[in-house]
Structures are given as structure tokens and as C-alpha cells.
């Protein structure tokens, strides 16, 4: 289950040893704070893990970004090694310096328009006063306790979204959000079909659905305590079976026309599999200047 211990949670709050680190992460719209299994917290930047935080027996530990990002460059200068950790955590300027250096390394290694859109969608949907709330980014089904022959392939989900408007059954739907930015992300007919098949495989697996629902409940509760969500979530009645959401982001009419073809392909495949039609969300990424 995606949850951290109460002791770990308190460390991010007022007076906790991780409070300054949390504040630096929370104030930066390019960083995403996500709860993971085994009591870990992972911080993402451009879809890449920039930091992992653990807390055990009253003491924190911090793992920086993977060596692959600086194999041919200079690693971040800020130390999170055991002997230096508590001192580093006391200095906001050092924490900001780490993320600045780490971002630069990731940016050199991998750029991503898709993440920028994904992050902005997350930031714009953090309130339960809105129709939709993004609960988690890059969620992945833990399968270590599932037999190899029963495991589901490619279970990483771009966005886990909760609908605050109840459906006809009086439940709040959980959506597995798949993000497509521009025509370069569609991967042709097979790409969109693969995503529908993957989602249907997940939805048809009772263990996967139960694990997702349990995680969503836990994540909402703990992120609310940390102030990462706004509004009242106590009236939610989460559905047991998630649905698919397809978020199509276009830049101009030509990209929209191409993505409209992808929309029909997705709907046709869903009908063939006898699954609920994906909820389509359109977003124009072009910015029109106005005064």
C-alpha cells in the first residue's frame, strides 16, 4: 500500500526534521511529491525520479538521483550522505541548490514537454472543489506478491484521477489517465490500441483494482494532511473498478485533427473489448497573448 508511517508523516510537518525539505519541494511547481510502497516518498521532475526519501527508526535517509544522469557530468555538489544529512536538511539554500543542479542534469539527459503538461494538469487539479482531482502521477501497480504468470504488463499510469461528481451508482469514479501530447506521442494505430488493451487488462484484474482503490484512499488522506490538496474529501465513495481517461493535448488544428482519429480508434477498441468508453479530455496547449 502507498502510505508512510505517522512518524514519517510528522517529520514533514512543523518542527519536523524534513519540514524544510518538504517546503522546498512544495514551493517548486516543477517537482512532484508522491507516496510509494515500503514507506518511501519519491520526488519526480520531468517524469524522472530526482530523490527518494525514507524514514526508519526515527531517522531519515535521502537517496539522490541515479548515477546515469551524471555519468558523463559532475554530480550534484550537495551531500545527503549519512554524516552530512542532518546538517544539509537544516539549510534551505543547500536544498534548493541540490534540486537546481539535479534538474540541470536531468534536463541534459532528457527533456520532456509531456511532463510539463502532466505537471500543470496536476497543479491545476488539486482541489476537491473542482470536478477532477489528480491524486497521483506515475502510479505503478506493485506486483511482487503476484504470480509471474498472472502479472500485468506495463502498469505505470500517467495520472490517477478522482471524479468528485458521483456517477449513477452514487460512487466517485477513479480514472486511469493516459496523456498524449501532440502527434509525436500517439505511436500510430497500434500505440493507442495498446493503451486501451493495457487499461482493460488492469480493469479486469480484481487484485489490481483493489490495490489501486486502497492506494487512492491512503494517498488522499495523507496528502490532505500535508496540505497538498484543498477542499473537503470526506464525502467520497470511491468506485471499486476504475475507468480509462484519455487526455489529448494539441497545438493547433492540424494536431487536433490527427488526435481526433486517435480518439475514434480508442473508442472502437473499447467497444470491441466491451469496456466502458474512455472519457476524453481535450486541452489546447497553445498560449494566446491577451491584454
Task: For each feature predicted by the language model, list its residue ranges.
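Charged, terminal alpha-helix-loop-beta segments
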Residues: 1-291
Amino acid at each position: 500500500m502507498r502510505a508512510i508511517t505517522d512518524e514519517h508523516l510528522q517529520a514533514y510537518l512543523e518542527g519536523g526534521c524534513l519540514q524544510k525539505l518538504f517546503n522546498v519541494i512544495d514551493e517548486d511547481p516543477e517537482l512532484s511529491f508522491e507516496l510509494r510502497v515500503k514507506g518511501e516518498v519519491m520526488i519526480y521532475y520531468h517524469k524522472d525520479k530526482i530523490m527518494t526519501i525514507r524514514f526508519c527508526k526515527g531517522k531519515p535517509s535521502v537517496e539522490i538521483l541515479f548515477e546515469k544522469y551524471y555519468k558523463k557530468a559532475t554530480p550534484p555538489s550537495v551531500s545527503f550522505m549519512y554524516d552530512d544529512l542532518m546538517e544539509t536538511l537544516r539549510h534551505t539554500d543547500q536544498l534548493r541548490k541540490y534540486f537546481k543542479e539535479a534538474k540541470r542534469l536531468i534536463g541534459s539527459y532528457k527533456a520532456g514537454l509531456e511532463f510539463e503538461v502532466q505537471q500543470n494538469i496536476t497543479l491545476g487539479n488539486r482541489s476537491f472543489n473542482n470536478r477532477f482531482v489528480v491524486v497521483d502521477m506515475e502510479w505503478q501497480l506493485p506486483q511482487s506478491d503476484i504470480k509471474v504468470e498472472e502479472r500485468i504488463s506495463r502498469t505505470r499510469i500517467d495520472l490517477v484521477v478522482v471524479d468528485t461528481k458521483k456517477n449513477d451508482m452514487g460512487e466517485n469514479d477513479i480514472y486511469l489517465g493516459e496523456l498524449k501530447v501532440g502527434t509525436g506521442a500517439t505511436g500510430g494505430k497500434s500505440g493507442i490500441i495498446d493503451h486501451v488493451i493495457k487499461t482493460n487488462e488492469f480493469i479486469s484484474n480484481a487484485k489490481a483494482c483493489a490495490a489501486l482503490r486502497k492506494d487512492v484512499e491512503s494517498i488522499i488522506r495523507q496528502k490532505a494532511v500535508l496540505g497538498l490538496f484543498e477542499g473537503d474529501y470526506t464525502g467520497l465513495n470511491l468506485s471499486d473498478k476504475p475507468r480509462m481517461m484519455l487526455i489529448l493535448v494539441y497545438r493547433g488544428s492540424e494536431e487536433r485533427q490527427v488526435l481526433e482519429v486517435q480518439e475514434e480508434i480508442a473508442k472502437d477498441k473499447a467497444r470491441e473489448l466491451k469496456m466502458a468508453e474512455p472519457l476524453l479530455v481535450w486541452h489546447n496547449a497553445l498560449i494566446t497573448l491577451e491584454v
